[in-house]
Amino acid sequence: MVIILAMTNREKFKVLADQIKISNQLEQDILEQGELTRIDVSNKNRTWTFQISLPHFLSHEDYLLFTHAIEEEFKEIATVAIDFSIKDTNNQDEFALKYFGHCIDQTRLSPKVKGQLKQKKLIMSGNVLKVLVSNDIERNHFDKACNGSLVKAFRQCGFEIDKVVFETDSTNHDDDLASLEAHIQQEDEQSAREATEKLEKMKAEKAKQQDNNESTVEKCQIGKPIQIENIKPIESIIEEEFKVAIEGVIFDINLKELKSGRHIVELKVTDYTDSLVLKMFTRKNKDDLDHFKALSVGKWVRAQGRIEEDTFVRDLVMMMSDIEEIKKTPKQDKAEDKRVEFHLHTSMSQMDGIPNISAYVEQAAKWGHQALAVTDHNVVQAFPDAHNAAEKHGIKMIYGMEGMLVDDGVPIAYKPTDRNLKDATYVVFDVETTGLSNQYDKIIELAAVKVHNGEIIDKFERFSNPHERLSETIINLTHITDDMLTDAPEIEEVLTEFKEWVGDAIFVAHNASFDMGFIDTGYERLGFGPSTNGVIDTLELSRTINTEYGKHGLNFLAKKYGVELTQHHRAIYDTEATAYIFIKMVQQMKELGVNNHLEINKKLTNEDAYKRARPSHVTLIVQNQEGLKNLFKIVSASLVKYYYRTPRIPRSLLNEYREGILIGTACDEGELFTAVMQKDQSEVEKIAKFYDFIEVQPPALYQDLMDRELIRDNETLTQIYKRLIDAGKSANIPVIATGNAHYLYEHDAIARKILIASQPGNPLNRSTLPEAHFRTTDEMLDDFHFLGEEKAYEIVVTNTNELANKIEKVVPIKDKLFTPRMDGANEEIRELSYSNAKKLYGEDLPQIVIDRLEKELDSIIGNGFSVIYLISQRLVKKSLDDGYLVGSRGSVGSSFVATMTEITEVNPLPPHYICSHCKTSEFFDDGSVGSGFDLPDKKCPTCGNELIKEGQDIPFETFLGFKGDKVPDIDLNFSGEYQPNAHNYTKVLFGEDKVFRAGTIGTVAEKTAFGFVKGYLNDQGIHKRGAEIDRLVKGCTGVKRTTGQHPGGIIVVPDYMDIYDFTPIQFPADDQSAAWMTTHFDFHSIHDNVLKLDILGHDDPTMIRMLQDLSGIDPKTIPVDDKETMQIFSGPESLGVTEDEILCKTGTFGVPEFGTGFVRQMLEDTKPTTFSELVQISGLSHGTDVWLGNAQELIRQGICDLSSVIGCRDDIMVYLMYAGLEPSMAFKTMEFVRKGRGLTDEMVEAMKENNVPDWYLDSCRKIKYMFPKAHAAAYVLMAVRIAYFKVHHPLYYYAAYFTIRASDFDLITMIKDKTSIRNTVKDMYSRYMDLGKKEKDVLTVLEIMNEMAHRGFRLQPISLEKSQAFDFIIEGDTLIPPFISVPGLGENVAQRIVEAREEGPFLSKEDLNKKAGLSQKVIDYLDELGSLPDLPDKAQLSIFDM
């Protein structure tokens, strides 16, 4: 007979993983697909053999962790053996090499021979493992010694290895023969082995005693002192060596106990040349463990030992013989007077900055800097953490941002003149130059064509001699060589001739600002002054009139306009192509009503002009609190209103909100730096007047400009610095030296390189990244020594400190909660509470009701929480009025005021009876009843009416704290389909500008970072050890990658403030089409400052609504203690089916909270019969270490029953108060236990004084997390209501379940008879390990369908005439599925079928395809389903159709 257990093998594996406490350490697919297939128990030998099936091999570390955890968990019960089977063995060759050393350890070879064997080379050939040995003696010995044991060891690990063959390696020598023979002679020295085992056991006992103790030594020192002259860089370690000494800093540490009782420490250490794993075992009779415990991440060590190839990780590691902790002097700022950094990027600079702001602040404080600025790219999301870090370290925080400044509109026409475009003469021209700077580079070719009436009428082409050699870059770009320029005329001659040739024609150029820059500079040097001719820029013109184009380069436009372009970047060819393109553009302008040069800018410029402007970097520094709010407005506008590929700040916007903000010139991508490269000094000084300070940065930060030949040489760079300094003097604004830091130390640069390399489109990939570490004062002074000591000190120290002193103390986040105002909220909450209480309990309220209301109202009103309650009440009332129940989450059900204001259905008073007629009540406040719903039915002793049963006995303290001053966190579960309505209703309540979605920040996760690191190393052709890869991964992890929104969180701004008092705003992930804007700050940062409503979506209220619509039954009238409903939690009998028929021992398939395999197993173990026991199970199933290894064992051992174990957090406080503990001590104990903090001596003493049993104390100590009882009660109440429909109105239930909760259907199986469906479910159980996620979802649906079929109901095929788009409908004792249930058929098509059939019947499959857009695959599926009876492939043409 085959017995199908209620739990699947997969669920058993999950239970096992939870029990041995490694669920969070296994890979997700292992956890989801692992299967415990069998446990063989031998009582005679006290041996348990676990048969475990996995989807793929575990890493060797995870394998050891897993097996060790199982052995430790059951060591007191039995000796454990584990046999693995692996589904996917395609890569077993790779893993066999990693497991080889472990499998050797399972044999009975001597330790020395094992060590020798581990060094051998391996070759996998099919299912045969070949081990290459040195000679025949070795081969014969190993073959005899292993005797199949190595094969067995591999097979236990899941390998399909049939044979291990030892073959002589012809490349090896026989040098080790004598040594080998000696090892063989030692093989049978059993006594020595036994002695060793004895010592190991003694050591294990000692280690167990010390395991949880703190280290008793201050500094790690094991073995001999290490000579510093022997230290070698880690990067130089490339092969096995006998003795090596290194030093480095620990970045990861793992200390674990072995089965023998010894410990092993594994350190990952780096000296920033490379990284290495160091290992060491505790020695016999030594205090090594204490020394190991003295080590921690961040400490420097010096270590010495043997470098060997680790056969498990296939990497070089050091087996340490000596280790000592050393003091390493950190980087210091030794300058007497410190600088202030005004340009710094944190991990909030998206995929660019590395450390979080706290690391910078801590470093600056250690260096003695008085202040520090943060200026992330385009965002201010580091501000909250910056404030906290600055307060902690006592440093002045300066808040700022590096933004993208754009002119409101980029002109298309310069120096417009009153000229008719049709009649005007144009000079279309192009220059080729020695570089991009018109101030420092020279024209080498000037070419132009003259255009009139749409025709080219003349040409001009001249080379000019630059008197310098061309760079390779320019030669390759322009195809102009030095030889071509040797005899060319001087530029003065060329420009003089050109000016005369041009006359008064309108200049036309592609990117005219560049070409005109060289012309104007040349004219001025000749004394002509800048050109007075009008100009048209075809680049900006195209961007304006060809908005549908994504590109506007000359190559692209030539193709679009059908113009031939040859030898791009030769002036004459570019000029001719531009001319023909421009001629066609003139016609386009005419069609747009532009006929005059004066009209171009006026008529073609639009509100999106900011998109065409080229952004320049700008630094914005907050000077005071007003400036902070203005910065928040600027940031918000740039992210919401002016976002185009990147957030943009129009100059007009900056001018509008610049009060309280200091504006700096930023980096080499700033407007002023560009002007120094492109304009004369008078223009530079004019631009400088817009700014409040000028930034200059170390020469190393401009190195990429020199590499790209944008700056010619150091002399040119020095001239640029001097011009910037002169501009500051002329504008009377300070010049400050800034570091543009992106990481802390020089060795962190690699992490930034990796992040930038992971972004293919990032322009920074085009050049070498500059040295952008956080510089000390001395470093910065040294960087600017070429300016002279006095000037360097002025810009590095004097000016930065003076500027910092001008900045007031600014606080970016509030220090208290600001809730919305609602007039009369206090009175309304009080009146609502008492009004509804009197409706329920009568005018003469019981004292227990009055006491509870007053206690709560004192806290709620006294702490200003009334408005929070009232908002929640309005939201719930709106949903109820619209016909949707609301489920509460969290602890709000602990509040009786919340119950009386109808925020929650959970009544937290002690269990009690109430008479709805005469209001007689009876309370049970002695702890004898777990839930009022469990009280026996009873007639009112006063009037004889049936009494109502209520009360869950939940203390108010679990909601607002013992003092009642904790900000209430009211989470509400709205119907998933109603949730958007609830969200939008907040706009009605408070106004659209007062509610925002709670923002989140997504950072680079460890697995993502690993991919970035591997990709970078592969692209660079670099091989690194695993330890170094781990270090690089840590460096990239945590950097901001994107933004998002909380699934249900709504932030409410009070009417007397605006959002910019708290945070900027943006769209989630910068998606400009999103329906809601979010807070710019992560909502956790402002959680204590503004009200956050948790308006969540849930299936239960949606299902309840559908059941109500189908049945007409008000769900609030459903009896919670219905006996037949309660019976399904312990068996399926009340459903009219047997366990064998539905393959389950309970009837809870599809019941929320109780339908999973894990909880069904709990139900089987506990057989609950009451509501309070169901609440217990809900609490037990959601807690951590509450059920497994705790309550489960207590129940199995008969120590207590389900009703008395600790299930929910509130149970602890209530139980302890009933036991006699002071309420404050009971509350404190509950808080400690629910947070996994165990019990203090004071708590233990109080509990023992009041005779709390020892098992209760032990249970408290094991708990890591607990579920609130109010939350559990709310969930169970919904579950019982749904279960009621399942028992008494089955077709309504199944229709609602399949419509609301199910998503993947196998309709072909579902329409079959019950036996066939059951057989399919059984078959899928047997193949569960092989099922994918989608198949498992189908199985869940089939379990419900099997139950439905055995209850006498069936599913019809899809009906073209009757099926709805989305809902299952009832017909007789059957359900008709909707179109959406067809695999591969989407929502739009489902709706289209319904709409199409209203126009008339489908005449054929071809007609179905045309009208509804069904694919052939879907039509074939419907055909197989029997949904298209007699429907021909094509319609027959009738004579009447002609």
Swiss-Prot record:
It comes from the Bacteria. The keyword Magnesium does not apply. GO terms for biological process: DNA-templated DNA replication. The keyword Hydrolase applies. Residues 426-582 form the Exonuclease domain. GO terms for cellular component: cytoplasm. This is DNA polymerase III PolC-type. The gene is polC.
